[in-house]
Protein backbone atom coordinates (compact mmCIF):
# COMPACT_ATOMS: atom_id res chain seq x y z
CA UNK A 1 0.00 0.00 0.00
CA UNK A 2 1.54 3.27 -1.13
CA UNK A 3 -0.68 5.69 0.78
CA UNK A 4 -2.19 6.06 4.21
CA UNK A 5 -5.83 7.11 4.50
CA UNK A 6 -6.14 10.87 5.04
CA UNK A 7 -8.82 12.27 7.33
CA UNK A 8 -8.70 15.82 5.98
CA UNK A 9 -11.82 16.92 4.11
CA UNK A 10 -10.91 17.57 0.50
CA UNK A 11 -12.09 17.28 -3.05
CA UNK A 12 -12.87 13.93 -4.62
CA UNK A 13 -10.50 12.37 -7.17
CA UNK A 14 -11.59 10.23 -10.10
CA UNK A 15 -9.05 8.47 -12.30
CA UNK A 16 -9.63 8.34 -16.05
CA UNK A 17 -8.07 5.45 -17.93
CA UNK A 18 -8.63 3.65 -21.20
CA UNK A 19 -8.56 0.18 -22.69
CA UNK A 20 -5.66 1.23 -24.94
CA UNK A 21 -3.64 4.22 -26.02
CA UNK A 22 -5.32 6.59 -28.47
CA UNK A 23 -8.77 5.60 -27.22
CA UNK A 24 -9.98 9.13 -26.37
CA UNK A 25 -9.04 9.59 -22.70
CA UNK A 26 -8.02 13.22 -23.14
CA UNK A 27 -11.24 14.24 -24.88
CA UNK A 28 -13.33 12.34 -22.33
CA UNK A 29 -11.47 13.91 -19.41
CA UNK A 30 -11.99 17.42 -20.75
CA UNK A 31 -15.66 16.88 -21.59
CA UNK A 32 -16.42 15.22 -18.26
CA UNK A 33 -14.74 18.12 -16.47
CA UNK A 34 -16.96 20.54 -18.37
CA UNK A 35 -20.08 18.52 -17.53
CA UNK A 36 -19.27 18.43 -13.83
CA UNK A 37 -18.37 22.13 -13.79
CA UNK A 38 -21.69 22.99 -15.43
CA UNK A 39 -23.53 21.16 -12.65
CA UNK A 40 -21.83 23.29 -10.01
CA UNK A 41 -18.76 21.25 -9.09
CA UNK A 42 -15.51 23.20 -8.99
CA UNK A 43 -13.57 20.86 -11.25
CA UNK A 44 -9.96 20.62 -12.44
CA UNK A 45 -8.10 18.02 -14.45
CA UNK A 46 -4.67 16.55 -13.86
CA UNK A 47 -2.38 14.44 -16.04
CA UNK A 48 -0.31 11.96 -14.08
CA UNK A 49 2.57 12.26 -16.57
CA UNK A 50 2.97 13.23 -20.22
CA UNK A 51 5.54 12.01 -22.68
CA UNK A 52 6.48 13.36 -26.09
CA UNK A 53 6.12 17.06 -25.27
CA UNK A 54 7.77 20.02 -23.54
CA UNK A 55 6.54 23.01 -21.57
CA UNK A 56 2.87 22.75 -20.63
CA UNK A 57 1.23 19.35 -21.04
CA UNK A 58 -0.51 19.10 -24.41
CA UNK A 59 -3.28 17.02 -22.85
CA UNK A 60 -3.87 19.59 -20.12
CA UNK A 61 -4.08 22.30 -22.79
CA UNK A 62 -6.68 20.20 -24.62
CA UNK A 63 -8.65 19.75 -21.38
CA UNK A 64 -8.82 23.51 -20.89
CA UNK A 65 -9.94 24.04 -24.48
CA UNK A 66 -12.73 21.50 -24.06
CA UNK A 67 -13.70 23.04 -20.71
CA UNK A 68 -13.85 26.49 -22.33
CA UNK A 69 -11.33 28.05 -19.95
CA UNK A 70 -7.79 29.41 -20.14
CA UNK A 71 -4.72 27.66 -18.80
CA UNK A 72 -4.68 27.94 -15.02
CA UNK A 73 -1.84 28.91 -12.70
CA UNK A 74 -1.62 25.27 -11.62
CA UNK A 75 -1.04 24.33 -15.27
CA UNK A 76 1.79 26.80 -15.72
CA UNK A 77 3.60 25.80 -12.52
CA UNK A 78 3.37 22.06 -13.28
CA UNK A 79 0.93 21.08 -10.54
CA UNK A 80 -1.56 19.60 -13.00
CA UNK A 81 1.15 17.57 -14.75
CA UNK A 82 4.12 16.99 -12.45
CA UNK A 83 6.12 14.95 -14.98
CA UNK A 84 6.81 15.94 -18.59
CA UNK A 85 9.18 13.98 -20.83
CA UNK A 86 10.32 14.74 -24.36
CA UNK A 87 10.78 11.07 -25.30
CA UNK A 88 7.47 9.63 -26.62
CA UNK A 89 7.20 6.34 -24.74
CA UNK A 90 5.72 4.77 -21.63
CA UNK A 91 6.61 6.94 -18.59
CA UNK A 92 8.96 4.37 -17.09
CA UNK A 93 11.04 4.27 -20.29
CA UNK A 94 10.83 8.00 -21.01
CA UNK A 95 12.16 8.70 -17.52
CA UNK A 96 15.02 6.23 -17.99
CA UNK A 97 15.98 7.70 -21.36
CA UNK A 98 16.15 11.18 -19.83
CA UNK A 99 17.99 10.04 -16.70
CA UNK A 100 15.13 10.87 -14.35
CA UNK A 101 12.95 9.00 -11.88
CA UNK A 102 9.23 9.26 -11.20
CA UNK A 103 8.41 9.68 -7.52
CA UNK A 104 4.79 8.75 -6.86
CA UNK A 105 4.70 11.03 -3.81
CA UNK A 106 5.47 14.01 -6.04
CA UNK A 107 2.36 13.16 -8.02
CA UNK A 108 0.36 12.60 -4.85
CA UNK A 109 1.39 15.95 -3.35
CA UNK A 110 0.34 17.72 -6.54
CA UNK A 111 -3.06 16.05 -6.34
CA UNK A 112 -3.39 17.06 -2.68
CA UNK A 113 -2.83 20.69 -3.62
CA UNK A 114 -5.58 20.51 -6.21
CA UNK A 115 -7.94 18.73 -3.82
CA UNK A 116 -7.66 21.66 -1.42
CA UNK A 117 -8.80 24.07 -4.14
CA UNK A 118 -11.41 22.08 -6.04
CA UNK A 119 -14.41 19.86 -5.36
CA UNK A 120 -13.36 17.35 -8.00
CA UNK A 121 -10.05 16.36 -9.61
CA UNK A 122 -10.11 14.21 -12.76
CA UNK A 123 -6.76 12.42 -13.02
CA UNK A 124 -5.99 11.23 -16.55
CA UNK A 125 -3.61 8.31 -16.87
CA UNK A 126 -1.16 7.47 -19.64
CA UNK A 127 -2.00 4.85 -22.26
CA UNK A 128 -3.92 1.88 -20.87
CA UNK A 129 -4.71 0.77 -17.35
CA UNK A 130 -1.60 -1.40 -16.91
CA UNK A 131 0.97 1.06 -18.25
CA UNK A 132 4.02 1.17 -15.93
CA UNK A 133 4.74 4.53 -14.32
CA UNK A 134 7.98 3.07 -13.00
CA UNK A 135 9.47 -0.41 -13.49
CA UNK A 136 7.72 -1.43 -10.24
CA UNK A 137 4.47 0.56 -10.33
CA UNK A 138 1.56 0.22 -12.77
CA UNK A 139 -1.04 2.95 -13.17
CA UNK A 140 -3.74 0.54 -11.97
CA UNK A 141 -1.81 -0.13 -8.77
CA UNK A 142 -1.36 3.60 -8.19
CA UNK A 143 -5.13 4.08 -8.54
CA UNK A 144 -5.84 1.15 -6.22
CA UNK A 145 -3.48 2.31 -3.50
CA UNK A 146 -4.79 5.87 -3.66
CA UNK A 147 -8.35 4.59 -3.29
CA UNK A 148 -9.68 6.36 -6.38
CA UNK A 149 -12.74 5.44 -8.37
CA UNK A 150 -12.19 4.91 -12.10
CA UNK A 151 -13.88 5.98 -15.32
CA UNK A 152 -12.84 3.63 -18.13
CA UNK A 153 -12.86 4.75 -21.76
CA UNK A 154 -13.78 2.05 -24.26
CA UNK A 155 -14.72 2.20 -27.93
CA UNK A 156 -16.82 0.68 -30.66
CA UNK A 157 -13.88 -0.45 -32.77
CA UNK A 158 -13.13 -4.11 -33.40
CA UNK A 159 -11.15 -5.65 -30.53
CA UNK A 160 -12.68 -3.45 -27.84
CA UNK A 161 -14.57 -6.30 -26.18
CA UNK A 162 -11.38 -8.15 -25.34
CA UNK A 163 -9.52 -5.05 -24.17
CA UNK A 164 -12.47 -3.82 -22.09
CA UNK A 165 -13.06 -7.14 -20.35
CA UNK A 166 -9.37 -7.47 -19.55
CA UNK A 167 -9.44 -3.98 -18.03
CA UNK A 168 -12.56 -4.76 -15.99
CA UNK A 169 -11.00 -7.97 -14.75
CA UNK A 170 -7.84 -6.08 -13.73
CA UNK A 171 -9.99 -3.61 -11.79
CA UNK A 172 -12.06 -6.33 -10.13
CA UNK A 173 -8.96 -8.24 -9.04
CA UNK A 174 -7.49 -5.08 -7.50
CA UNK A 175 -10.70 -3.83 -5.92
CA UNK A 176 -10.76 -0.65 -8.02
CA UNK A 177 -14.35 0.65 -8.21
CA UNK A 178 -15.32 1.31 -11.82
CA UNK A 179 -17.70 4.28 -11.71
CA UNK A 180 -18.56 4.46 -15.42
CA UNK A 181 -17.58 3.40 -18.91
CA UNK A 182 -17.47 6.03 -21.62
CA UNK A 183 -18.18 4.35 -24.95
CA UNK A 184 -16.36 6.21 -27.72
CA UNK A 185 -18.33 5.86 -30.96
CA UNK A 186 -15.88 7.81 -33.13
CA UNK A 187 -14.32 4.51 -34.18
CA UNK A 188 -17.42 2.68 -35.35
CA UNK A 189 -17.58 1.31 -38.89
CA UNK A 190 -20.44 -1.17 -38.62
CA UNK A 191 -23.47 -0.40 -36.46
CA UNK A 192 -24.01 -4.10 -35.71
CA UNK A 193 -20.53 -4.33 -34.20
CA UNK A 194 -20.93 -1.05 -32.32
CA UNK A 195 -24.32 -1.99 -30.86
CA UNK A 196 -23.30 -5.52 -29.88
CA UNK A 197 -20.01 -4.39 -28.36
CA UNK A 198 -21.89 -1.92 -26.17
CA UNK A 199 -24.30 -4.65 -25.03
CA UNK A 200 -21.47 -7.04 -24.17
CA UNK A 201 -19.65 -4.33 -22.20
CA UNK A 202 -22.79 -3.37 -20.26
CA UNK A 203 -23.34 -7.03 -19.34
CA UNK A 204 -19.70 -7.38 -18.30
CA UNK A 205 -20.04 -4.48 -15.87
CA UNK A 206 -22.67 -6.47 -13.99
CA UNK A 207 -20.68 -9.69 -14.16
CA UNK A 208 -17.61 -8.05 -12.63
CA UNK A 209 -19.59 -6.38 -9.86
CA UNK A 210 -19.90 -2.88 -11.34
CA UNK A 211 -23.58 -3.09 -12.25
CA UNK A 212 -24.40 0.42 -11.01
CA UNK A 213 -21.85 2.02 -13.34
CA UNK A 214 -23.47 3.80 -16.32
CA UNK A 215 -22.32 3.38 -19.91
CA UNK A 216 -22.09 6.86 -21.42
CA UNK A 217 -21.80 7.36 -25.17
CA UNK A 218 -19.33 9.77 -26.75
CA UNK A 219 -20.27 10.77 -30.28
CA UNK A 220 -20.00 13.76 -32.60
CA UNK A 221 -22.41 15.76 -30.45
CA UNK A 222 -20.39 15.16 -27.28
CA UNK A 223 -21.05 13.11 -24.16
CA UNK A 224 -24.54 11.71 -23.69
CA UNK A 225 -24.23 11.95 -19.90
CA UNK A 226 -27.44 12.71 -18.03
CA UNK A 227 -27.46 14.45 -14.62
CA UNK A 228 -28.32 11.10 -13.07
CA UNK A 229 -25.24 9.54 -14.66
CA UNK A 230 -22.99 12.21 -13.18
CA UNK A 231 -24.56 11.71 -9.77
CA UNK A 232 -23.99 7.94 -9.96
CA UNK A 233 -20.35 8.48 -10.87
CA UNK A 234 -19.70 10.69 -7.85
CA UNK A 235 -22.05 8.97 -5.41
CA UNK A 236 -22.57 5.34 -6.43
CA UNK A 237 -25.68 3.70 -4.93
CA UNK A 238 -24.85 1.65 -1.87
CA UNK A 239 -21.54 3.39 -1.15
Curated annotation (Swiss-Prot):
ATP binds at residues 22-27, 59, 124-127, 184-185. Keywords: ATP-binding, Biotin biosynthesis, Cytoplasm, Ligase, Magnesium, Metal-binding, Nucleotide-binding. Pathway: Cofactor biosynthesis; biotin biosynthesis; biotin from 7,8-diaminononanoate: step 1/2. Pfam families: AAA_26 (PF13500). One of its GO terms (cellular component) is cytosol. Substrate binds at residue 51. Mg(2+) binds at residues 26, 59, 124. SUPFAM superfamilies: P-loop containing nucleoside triphosphate hydrolases. Its main location: cytoplasm. InterPro entries: DTB_synth_BioD, P-loop_NTPase. Belongs to the dethiobiotin synthetase family. This is ATP-dependent dethiobiotin synthetase BioD. It comes from Chlorobaculum tepidum (strain ATCC 49652 / DSM 12025 / NBRC 103806 / TLS) (Chlorobium tepidum). The lineage of its organism: Bacteria, Pseudomonadati, Chlorobiota, Chlorobiia, Chlorobiales. The gene is bioD.
Amino acid sequence: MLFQKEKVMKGQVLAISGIDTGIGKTVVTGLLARCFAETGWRTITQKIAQTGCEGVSEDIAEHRKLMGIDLQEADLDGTTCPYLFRFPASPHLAATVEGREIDFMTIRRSTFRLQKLYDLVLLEGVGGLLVPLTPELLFADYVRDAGYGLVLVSASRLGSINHTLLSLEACARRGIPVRAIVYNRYFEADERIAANTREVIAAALKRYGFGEAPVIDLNTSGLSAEPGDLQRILNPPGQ
